């Protein structure tokens, strides 16, 4: 099937920045360079441009100076054997422009089409399969950097993306240790970079060879952020600003920022809060999220195209388990101590399972850039707004031996119901896992003897950060 070739065409005098914009929009990591008569001059990839930027070449430079002037091409009379002969010699080739006698582009074969052709020749396919540079069967071209990829959300997202065939790079300081990625560290499509998002040199190293960044690496949660306010501002705001600026400079234009529904603070009369509702952050954590959102969106220029995701409160099992999240905590208390203590209880919280949250991030990665550029999405489901009392009641119903105690002290002021219609309408995303699913999986795991060391500070962000600060 022929493509809309115009999506790939750039003029030989176009700048690197203009060409990168075209590459981002066609979504295939390549542009075809033509002259004023639309005759083929060469091709360039996003990787070529990013390597040039690292070398100090200006974004205003003409693409003619950078393009590959002698790429492998096909003529319009090509046969499947022509394609297989080429791929035998160049098994990592992902694109083949098809030219007519006048050197005008008639089509371009992309990765999946090349594989479909070569699969019909079993002997060739065997050679490709055994090659160290074998071609992947899916069209997944994106190379994803996840900062905080060993964290509660990141370790789940990393696995989901690897299962879908993506190449994933993780930049993580590993303050909670390496165990969350231990079982997948030998995956050939995973690159692990121990590093700190506060260090520019680590950022520059990590963003090379990627075209999408998911930024998760921050101090997470109100109590943890309150321990060292200066460090929170440095990591959650200043470092976030630096990594976003670096991505813009190096033309990594699909940037996904993990914000939080806590930026809304408190709902009025149980109003459903949508993306344009007034924000009212009640903590340093929430304020830094909101400031980061504004700074990141302020960097958008029509080419750098960030997306802001305001996460609902997360629950469920993860390779980097946490027991300082409301559903996880109350379930733990019910199973291990037989008692659930709720402070207040009338506060509303939107909830989402960590696996569903990772699915939502993947949906943003896979969406056409025009659908998600410079957008803010609440991430969750309307049916998953609960009061803390509702959560306690669900646990009590599932595990009736546990007692529920309500205390009218130390009441959390955060109270918000959130509207998630936008992400459902624009991206057809809905959570698939229920509150009951999350409670049951955690309870079952606890009953099987997992997390017997549940009091260990490693499961609680604030305790672990405080302990780490004392050590340092």
Each model region followed by its residue ranges:
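N-terminal Rossmann/SDR dinucleotide-binding element
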Residues: 127-212
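C-terminal substrate-binding subdomain of Rossmann-fold SDR/epimerase-dehydratase oxidoreductases
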Residues: 338, 342-472
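Conserved Rossmann-fold NAD(P)-dependent oxidoreductase catalytic core, especially the SDR/UDP-sugar
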Residues: 241-284
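Active-site Tyr-X1-5-Lys
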Residues: 266, 280-307, 335-336
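The conserved cystathionine-beta-synthase
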Residues: 9-28, 34, 53, 73-94, ...
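Flexible, glycine-rich beta-alpha linker
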Residues: 264-265, 280-284, 307-325
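NAD(P)H-binding glycine-rich loop region in Rossmannoid oxidoreductase-like domains
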Residues: 197-235
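Short beta->alpha transition motifs characteristic of CBS
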Residues: 11, 25-28, 32, 40-54, ...
């Amino acid at each position: 099937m022929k493509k809309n070739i115009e999506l790939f065409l750039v003029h030989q005098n176009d700048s690197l920045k203009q060409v990168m914009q075209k590459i981002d929009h066609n979504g295939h990591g390549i542009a075809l360079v033509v002259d004023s008569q639309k005759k083929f001059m060469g091709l360039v990839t996003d990787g070529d441009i990013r390597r040039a930027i690292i070398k100090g070449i200006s974004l205003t430079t003409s693409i003619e100076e950078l393009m590959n002037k002698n790429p492998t091409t096909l003529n319009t009379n090509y046969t499947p054997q022509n394609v297989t002969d080429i791929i035998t010699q160049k098994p990592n080739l992902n694109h083949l422009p098809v030219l007519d006698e006048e050197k005008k582009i008639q089509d371009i074969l992309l990765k999946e089409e090349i594989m479909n052709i070569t699969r019909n020749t079993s002997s060739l396919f065997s050679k490709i399969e055994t090659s160290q540079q074998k071609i992947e069967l899916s069209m997944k071209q994106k190379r994803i950097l996840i900062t905080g990829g060993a964290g509660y959300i990141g370790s789940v997202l990393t696995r989901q993306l690897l299962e879908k065939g993506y190449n994933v790079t993780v930049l993580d300081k590993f303050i909670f240790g390496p165990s969350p990625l231990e079982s997948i560290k030998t995956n050939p499509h995973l690159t692990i970079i121990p590093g700190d998002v506060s260090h520019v040199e680590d950022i520059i190293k990590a963003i090379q060879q990627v075209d999408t960044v998911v930024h998760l690496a921050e101090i997470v949660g109100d109590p943890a952020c309150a321990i060292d306010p200066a460090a929170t501002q440095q990591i959650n705001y200043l470092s976030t600003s630096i990594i976003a600026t670096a991505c813009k400079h190096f033309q990594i234009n699909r940037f996904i920022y993990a914000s939080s529904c806590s930026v809304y603070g408190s709902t009025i009369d149980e109003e459903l809060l949508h993306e344009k509702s007034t924000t009212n952050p009640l903590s340093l954590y929430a304020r830094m999220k909101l400031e980061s959102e504004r700074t990141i969106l302020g960097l958008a220029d029509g080419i750098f195209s960030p997306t802001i995701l305001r996460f609902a409160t997360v629950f469920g099992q993860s390779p980097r388990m946490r027991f300082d999240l409301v559903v996880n905590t109350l379930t733990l208390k019910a199973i291990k101590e037989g008692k659930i203590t709720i402070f207040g209880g009338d506060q509303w919280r939107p909830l989402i399972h960590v696996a569903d949250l990772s699915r939502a991030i993947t949906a943003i990665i896979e969406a056409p850039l025009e659908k998600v550029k410079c957008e803010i999405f609440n991430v969750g489901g309307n049916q998953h707004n609960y009061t803390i009392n509702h959560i306690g009641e669900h646990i009590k119903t599932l595990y009736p031996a546990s007692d529920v105690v309500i205390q009218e002290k130390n009441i959390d002021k955060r109270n918000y119901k959130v509207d998630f219609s936008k992400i459902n309408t624009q991206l057809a995303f809905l959570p698939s896992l229920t509150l009951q699913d999350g409670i049951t999986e955690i309870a079952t795991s606890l009953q099987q003897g997992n997390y017997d060391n549940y009091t260990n500070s490693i499961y609680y962000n604030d305790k672990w950060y405080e302990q780490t600060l004392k050590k340092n």
